[in-house]
Amino acid sequence: MSKFKSLLLMFGTLILLSGCSNVEVFNAKGPVASSQKFLIIYSIIFMLVIVAVVLTMFAIFIFKYSYNKNSETGKMHHNSLIETIWFVVPIIIVIALSIPTVKTLYDYEKPPESKEDPMVVYAVSAGYKWFFAYPEQKVETVNTLTIPKNRPVVFKLQAMDTMTSFWIPQLGGQKYAMTGMTMNWTLQADETGTFRGRNSNFNGEGFSRQTFKVHSVDQSEFDSWVKDAKSKKTLSQDEFDKQLLPSTPNKELTFSGTHMAFVDPAADPEYIFYAYKRYNYVQKDPNFVAEKDLYKDVTDKPQKPARKVQITNANYKRHGMKPMILGNNDPYDNEFKKEEDHNSKEMEKISKSAKDENASKFGSKADNDHGGGH
């Protein structure tokens, strides 16, 4: 009995202490996260009511209709009312859950309503790090992000190695970043503060350290931050390539200029492999290689010249897209934005085509998997 009490006390304490944790998803600081919070709470309450009704009916049937020696064998009869209820009620439940879910999912793709024009930030994952390039401000950060409050931010998500998932729980849900693609994801912070961001898609041994901080500040403070960032060291191609290596420690860094001056990761997905060669980095399995030997051959200085702008993504030529190259002295003007919009539309077409193709393959596979003499 004492053992049972100890276990009960332990689990009870864990449950109570869990209430003291900061559940970021329920601590929304932006319009997208707020709509997700409503949907989650709505779904939980709805399903709790269903569970409560089912368990109550289950208990009633057990105690009221339990078998005893005086029980008579029941006879089944057709009952239109009961049959209607068990068909109609589940349909109503599915509709009640589907309508707000579908509406919210489609609303995610629309920029939050704001008087301010959206700010564009290129968010690139590589080497278990996050790189944030500000094309208009001409600055770039690593593992840290600063955004103005009450202004929508259009994140253009790209991956240079493994597929990752960009997630800031207090601002909105996650969206995948994939090699050879640029995916748009618009978020907004309604309050000032510091929030946590991370990669939510397991992608290797460095997954746990692929995190970043998000600083939401007033516009005046953001302008001051940009001014200070422009006084930092200019991001060179050598420095950028070195930061792409998983062997380079994860640090919060700020640079003047951006990597957009010399590479568009979506247009040149093979770029990172050349960066590996420049520093003699060879990928090794940490399960079979001692930790001290993983990066022993990596050099401090590049052994090859910097890579020139190239297009190794066949979709770019196929869809008439240009690499998004923006020099540090070039204006982020309407002409460049026009090319951005064109690329975004073509990327959406590519994504939709891939989804349709996968759905078609899945459908044909399901047909072939049916039983019979095949």
Swiss-Prot record:
- Sequence intervals crossing the membrane: 43-63, 82-102
* BP GO terms, sorted: ATP synthesis coupled electron transport
Record-given protein name: Probable quinol oxidase subunit 2
PROSITE patterns reported for this sequence: COX2_CUA, COX2_TM, PROKAR_LIPOPROTEIN
**One GO MF term attached to the UniProt entry:** cytochrome-c oxidase activity
PANTHER family per the UniProt record, alphabetical:
CYTOCHROME BO(3) UBIQUINOL OXIDASE SUBUNIT 2, CYTOCHROME C OXIDASE, SUBUNIT II
* UniProt EC number: 1.10.3.-
Membrane protein topology class: Multi-pass membrane protein
| GO cellular component terms, A-Z | plasma membrane
Q: Which reaction does it catalyse?
A: 2 a quinol + O2 = 2 a quinone + 2 H2O
Main function: Catalyzes quinol oxidation with the concomitant reduction of oxygen to water. Subunit II transfers the electrons from a quinol to the binuclear center of the catalytic subunit I.
Q: Which CDD domains match?
A: CuRO_UO_II
Key word S-adenosyl-L-methionine present = no
Q: Lipidation annotated as S-diacylglycerol cysteine: which positions?
A: C20
Q: Where is the composition biased (Basic and acidic residues)?
A: 334-374
Q: Name one Pfam family in it.
A: COX2_TM
- Cell compartments where the protein resides: Cell membrane
